[in-house]
Design a protein with these regions (language model features):
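Signature of N-terminal electron-transfer/Fe-S-associated modules in redox systems
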Residues: 1-105
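Cofactor-binding beta-sheet edge motifs in enzyme active sites
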Residues: 38, 68, 72, 79-85, ...
Length: 167
């Protein structure tokens, strides 16, 4: 992070919306499948917010250029859903669309399989409350068992014995 002046206001993903009142960018990221693993989502949302504060009506190319210039990287989405979300959120922020227009509505038949139903974990990811890696292990109860992955040294072999003494 670049040096911040004393008493400067620093806004983070946790401060732009809540579960009850999402920011348009948070809602759009959920609706347009811009949240996959979610690791990059807070950075993209905050970066997009900065863009829309400077340019409320960007083109798709300007959105992509902004993310490139500011070092936002995602390995999961292919970027199209992220740009879609920014464009739709921008329309809400300009007053051209309502939040309901960018909110997932279940199909009339109630079918969710094959629909664009947002991932159940999307909300925690756009709010910045999702735990990753060491965050999770720090919250586990004492005595929790852990898994160690051991890869085979051969493609095909018959297991004759396992030494579980250290397990």
């Amino acid at each position: 992070m670049k040096q911040v002046k004393a008493y400067a206001k620093v806004e983070t993903i946790e401060g732009i919306g809540s579960a009850e009142r999402l920011h348009p960018l948070q809602r759009a990221f959920m609706t347009y499948a811009s949240v996959q693993c979610g690791f990059c989502s807070p950075g993209f949302i905050m970066s997009a917010k900065g863009l829309l504060m400077r340019n409320p009506d960007p083109t798709r190319e300007e959105v992509r250029e902004w993310f490139t210039r500011h070092g936002n990287v995602c390995r999961c989405t292919g970027y199209k859903p992220i740009v879609d979300a920014v464009m739709e959120a921008a329309a809400v922020m300009r007053g051209e669309k309502a939040m309901e227009d960018i909110t997932f509505t279940p199909p009339e038949d109630g079918r969710l399989y094959g629909s664009d139903f947002p991932k159940p974990t999307a909300l925690s990811r756009v709010l910045g409350t999702c735990d990753f890696g060491a965050d999770i292990s720090g919250k586990m109860p004492e005595g929790t068992l852990h898994l160690a992955v051991v890869l085979a040294k051969r493609e095909h072999a018959r297991i004759r014995a396992l030494d579980t003494a250290e397990a």
